[in-house]
Amino acid sequence: MTKALQLARALVPELSPSLHKGQAGRLGVVGGSKDYTGAPFFSAMAAMRIGVDLAHIICEPKAGDVIKTYAPDLIVHRVLDQNAPIEEIHQSVDDVVSRLHVLVVGPGLGRDDHMQACAGAAISIAKKRDIGLVIDADGLWFVNNNIDAIKGYKKAILTPNVMEMKRLCEKLSINPDEMKEEDIASKVSELLGGVTVLEKGGVDRITNGSKTLTVDASGSLKRCGGQGDILSGAAGTLLAWGSVYAKGIGSDKDIKVPHEDIPLYAAYGASTFTRECSRLTFEEKGRSMITQDMLKNLIQAGSFIEYATFSNNYYDIDAQGVKIIKDKHQNLQPTFVFLSPPSIDSLARRLVKRGSETEESLRSRLDAAKGEMEYAQTGAFDYVIVNDDIEQAYEKLRKVALGEGTESDILPDNRIA
């Protein structure tokens, strides 16, 4: 796993009985006009499926009537009425935004003057409330015509596609022909005052002007409309979680994300997640794939955020995670390897010698290790490697990873090597 993905995953709040409704993310989507009702639904529902607690859609009244029939899980506010005074709309939007961690502006917004004015009001309110912003689709049309509205707001993520990026470059007087392709997004971010840019393309480039990350994982060959809306919901979710993370709620992970880089890693995680979801859906549906199919694969694609913690230590997948994957992701066909200490006594000696444990944490870790070693003997793992010599254990693990493991190297069927 890349360091960037570890940092993105660190934003994910642990589910805990101590959290109450809304603390795992409250997201809003501004969009949904007379012509477009699917886009805001996909964005908000993607956020719900990925893991936010609450998702609101702020939309035009007729669009709201339709969106309300899609899913009872979404909270729909039909307040962007072209016949209402802009002051009334501003107050209605502010009432909703005041409850949110993040606002996504653009899915299904449209470009008529009224909806563009509503986008401007929403962006202004989000900035005043100091919450995360994701700007996509026709929200970028507004930004392109009102650059100062977003310049310098470092809690924002822009998600331009090829054409939207071209417009931004023209607006900012950037000549792409005079630059390396990989430097264009960084220059856009720099001229926007450090706003995070997620440039969508064959390779997604994510940058805040000083740091640049890339995602080139395979996605879908079918470019059906709506995948960008899934991405905006994913980015909004991780940015909402970043807000929770910055407040120290629901996360005790050792991996620390600099607060100024939260939008960067939120965008990186969203890109990785969406590409994986798109790939899985295309493998299943092929040419007939539509965006609605992706919603069904969001949970499976979300396996990248599986993690476990113990005594405030962070692990990718432990025995608990193996159980989750076996139960919920049977089609992945992974190879499960358990790295075992030679014995509980030897583990205890190692931990005592390390001097990093209190009596209470030592007892807890040994109890947990005993349970996991017993679980390893139930047939749950393809290989059990005893870590009594780090170099030998590494060599055995390397052979497993390369498919070179044999019974003489590593005894399968859960017999300890």
Predicted regions, residues:
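Short glycine-/polar-rich loops that comprise or flank the Walker A/P-loop
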Residues: 53, 330-335, 379-381
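Conserved phosphate-donor/acceptor-positioning beta-strand/loop module used by diverse small-molecule
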Residues: 323, 331-354
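Small-molecule kinase domains that catalyze NTP-dependent phosphoryl transfer to phosphate-bearing small molecules
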Residues: 356-403, 412-417
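Conserved AAA+ ATPase "sensor/coupling" helix adjacent to the nucleotide-binding pocket
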Residues: 171-172, 302-305, 350-357, 400-403
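Small-residue (G/A/S/T)-rich helix-start motifs and N-terminal tracts that mark the onset
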Residues: 1-134, 141-157, 162, 166-297, ...
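A short, charged, Gly/Pro-tolerant segment at domain boundaries
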Residues: 271-275, 407-417
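Switch/connector loops and helix/strand junctions flanking conserved nucleotide-binding motifs
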Residues: 167, 324-326, 344-350, 392-396
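ATP-dependent small-molecule kinase phosphotransfer cores
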Residues: 292-321
